[in-house]
Amino acid sequence: MSVSELLENKKKLVPRSINTLYQSGKEAVHDPDAAIQDIITQGKDKKIEPKLDGLAAKAKGIDWPTLIWIGGMHLAALAAPFYFSWSGLAICLVLCWVTGCLGVTLGYHRLLTHGSFVTSKPVRWFFAFVGGISGEGSAIVWVANHRKHHRFSDQDGDPHSPREGGWWSHILWLFPKHSSDEIQAHCKRWAPDLAKDSGVMFFHKTFLLWHFVIGGGLLATGWAIYGLDTGVSWLLWGLAVRMVYVFHVTWFVNSATHIWGYRNYETTDDSRNLWWVGLLAFGEGWHNNHHAFQRMAAHGHKWWEFDMTYWVILAMERLGLVWNVVHTPRGTGQTASPESGGAVVKSA
């Protein structure tokens, strides 16, 4: 569906006060209008914002736990072909969709970062959980990094701009060492709404635990049913291979879609639409569209820009699990025509 078609079928959202952000109930569970946009668009606060970005971060030393975590998963994934099983592959594919599409793309990104729709606390906590078992960090850390990326996209302050190197934007930005005080201040600065969410903070504090629970469960279940080799297969394919896949398709959004591809809209950053990232990353590869209309639930704006995650959101809306979905473009603070919803349409 094109942007013009979306505008013709425009659905109005009633703005609510920021005070409703933390209230429970269907009418006021999450208020992206007042809270999230204020967080993303506000200026730097030198008193509480640590330097967690750019070249300056590279001099802080290495975060060895993160390096070992990511490196270990890659090494384990290399062993997976020696323990191949069709059941292991099936588990891998299902969990890729659950953690990548539902967890990272729909939950972490479109709901918790940008507030593209409203849902209940239990559903939001479910997305925080399945996003966490993707292995990409807890919801509050992920969201804080991504909101900061939008505030300073491809400028000084962007945590992972390819202007500082393709490998930096893809993976190396994850490895500089930061103190717990810096990380806490970073999350307070960029995700204060999530810091006050008890469910999100529970999964933040128990982030590592769930990986041991799931890994142990896969190993034990496969072993009990089919034998040790199958248990190892389920562990390697259901944990390591799945995690490495979701890692890289997410990282390609940070790197590749700011380097290659085409642009439907003129934005102040280097964002691009890249078809193969769109397919692999459940619709996240239409990144120029997203940077033009950050709160819009649909990232694919042309009929052929396949966006699986938006289809899931539509299905959940039909079932009454989510509501106030941002179907139409809403302003990004840029000066533009009404037809573009806040971005400048690039001429053909």
Q: What is each PLM-predicted segment?
A:
Residues 1-251, 296-348:
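Non-catalytic, topology-defining segments of multipass membrane proteins
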Residues 99, 103, 257, 279-281:
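Short glycine- and Lys/Arg-enriched binding-loop motifs that mark or flank ligand-binding interfaces
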Residues 110, 255, 259, 291:
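Catalytic glutamate of the conserved HExxH
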